[in-house]
Regions:
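Conserved donor-binding loops in enzymes that form glycosidic bonds
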Residues: 13, 46, 190
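Short N-terminal amphipathic alpha-helix/helix-capping patch enriched in small hydrophobics
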Residues: 23-28, 50, 54, 58
Length: 239
């Protein structure tokens, strides 16, 4: 008999795309280690994407057939949405539209069979403009700047959507800002360092552990397998 393997889905922008990178921000890798032989951690990260583009591609990536066995679905957008509307109009998404896009994604996931209590929203993290510009200049890059003052507006919008739909949420901005030396969490003023990745992992882990029983690994422990009759191991596989 086949074994259903629970899934943890991380859907977001570059913060998710880079989340398995061991050289920068491996928070998905940390989750995968914590939930090994318990659940698959699946990343669907799209660098440079906004909530607007995420809303468009969501039905092309997730549908009734592959949403089965998903026990947790994390939505993590907003980093690009708050780009300056004059500096980067192709990225900028007004905060009202950001809220609407999150709501539409939630509604779509519900429509294909995902229970709302499995959805987790994560707010944008803090932005350090000086560090970001220095990083870009050192590499000869021209990247869209953000206005540090409007970040809290998008954070609040995300939290309000979560509250409206009774979803669990993580205030990444607030949790990082609690540290007096919060810029250490950001490698370039925007994306996470290894310290930032560890914090994200520590914030997500207890929420995921409430949704997925991580007390026992799937399939029998090797010590419980009869080396003479290994087929007997199937008897201890949960049905």
């Amino acid at each position: 008999m086949s074994v259903a393997w629970p899934k943890i889905v991380l859907f977001g922008d570059s913060q998710v795309q880079f989340s398995f990178d061991p050289t920068s921000s491996p928070w998905a890798a940390l989750l995968a280690t914590r939930f090994q032989r318990v659940a698959d951690v699946i990343t669907r990260g799209f660098s440079g994407y906004t909530s607007r583009s995420a809303r468009i591609i969501l039905p092309r990536i997730f549908y009734p057939e592959n949403i089965l066995d998903v026990e947790a679905f994390v939505i993590f957008f907003g980093t690009n949405d708050l780009s300056g509307k004059d500096d980067a109009p192709q990225y900028h998404v007004p905060v009202e539209d950001y809220s609407e896009n999150l709501e539409e994604m939630i509604k779509y996931l519900e429509s294909i069979g995902l229970k709302k209590d499995k959805i987790i929203l994560m707010t944008p993290g803090p932005y350090h403009g000086e560090k970001f510009l220095k990083f870009c200049e050192e590499r000869g890059r021209t990247l869209p700047s953000r206005d540090e003052k409007i970040v809290p507006e998008y954070v609040e919008a995300c939290l309000n959507v979560a509250k409206k739909h009774n979803l669990e949420s993580i205030n990444v901005y607030e949790e990082m800002k609690k540290d007096e030396d919060w810029p250490r969490f950001l490698i370039d003023g925007l994306h996470f360092t290894s310290d930032g990745a560890t914090l994200i992992y520590e914030l997500l882990k207890p929420i995921l552990e409430k949704k997925i029983d991580a007390s026992e690994m799937l399939m029998p422990d090797w010590r419980d397998i009869n080396s003479v009759k290994p087929e007997d191991a199937s008897k201890s596989v949960p049905v």
